[in-house]
Amino acid sequence: YKRQMDKYAFMDALKAGKFNHEKIDVIFHEGACSDTMEYNGKYMMENNFEYTKNVLHFCLDRKIQMMYASSASTYGSGAHGFREEPACEEALNVYAFSKLFFDNYLRRLLPQAQSQVVGLRYFNVYGPQENHKGKMASMIYQMYNQWKAEHKVRLFGEYAGYGPGEHTRDFVYVKDVVKVNFYFWDHPEISGIFNCGTGHAHQFNTLAKAVLNHFGSGELEYVPFPEVLKGKYQSFTEADDTNLLAAGYDGGFTPIEEAAEEYCQLLDKTGGYYVYEG
């Protein structure tokens, strides 16, 4: 990395005009407070709405391409489907609300925008370079480390009509997320909000078995569903990729078993980080 900056230092520099004369082709704005259990609305809006809004206007004013991380959390329970349209959107927590609030802000500006802006609604992303996320790192990362510590992995028990470990998500490998971002970078004529998921949902049990298969042993344990998550938890997600495919993306998505094993091997080797070996 070059010129790494703290997020607050970056925003101070942006507002002070420190980047006004830089040649910038594209900004990938992937950062946010992604803690779905964060209840401080002011903090969440400052980090996920105001911060992103400042980056957006910097890009629009200078006609810089911008890709930013939206979230599948904007669909809530998914009772109305997972299409990129208001009829399907239902924020269940402060994080989801902050993401949806910005998406709607962008929708009002897009007709007048003279440069590309793409919001990607990430589903359950997993893969390398996520160690720093702590409790918000992917479930496969959590399960891998549970096995290393205890030779077992734990999943939630039954809740909302789903059996133990049967809550179902659209798990998408971070390598594929990068491919989607780069596709839009190569197509500056396309703007909008698009789902970024495989279009195929899998149970958490499937991920757990992939981890256990990697190690060749271990126990799968189910724990009571936490009271604090009831009413705020997405039991099912599955991207509707109609608009993504209509935009021309044809890079496909890595099968979950293949990606999970590749990631586990990298966790074995480096703790989950790509290491430059030049």
Feature map (PLM): residue ranges:
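Short-chain dehydrogenase/reductase
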Residues: 45, 91-100, 133-141, 170-171, ...
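Conserved Rossmann-fold NAD(P)-dependent oxidoreductase catalytic core, especially the SDR/UDP-sugar
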Residues: 23-29, 53-94
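Short alpha-helix in the Rossmann-fold core of NAD(P)-dependent oxidoreductases
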Residues: 47-52, 59, 67, 98-99, ...
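Conserved small/polar residues in nucleotide/adenosyl-binding loops
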Residues: 1
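Active-site Tyr-X1-5-Lys
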Residues: 61, 77, 92-123, 142-149
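NAD(P)H-binding glycine-rich loop region in Rossmannoid oxidoreductase-like domains
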Residues: 7-47
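C-terminal substrate-binding subdomain of Rossmann-fold SDR/epimerase-dehydratase oxidoreductases
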Residues: 147-278
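Glycine-rich "substrate-gating" loop/helix at the edge of Rossmann-like oxidoreductase active sites
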Residues: 92, 123-137, 158-175
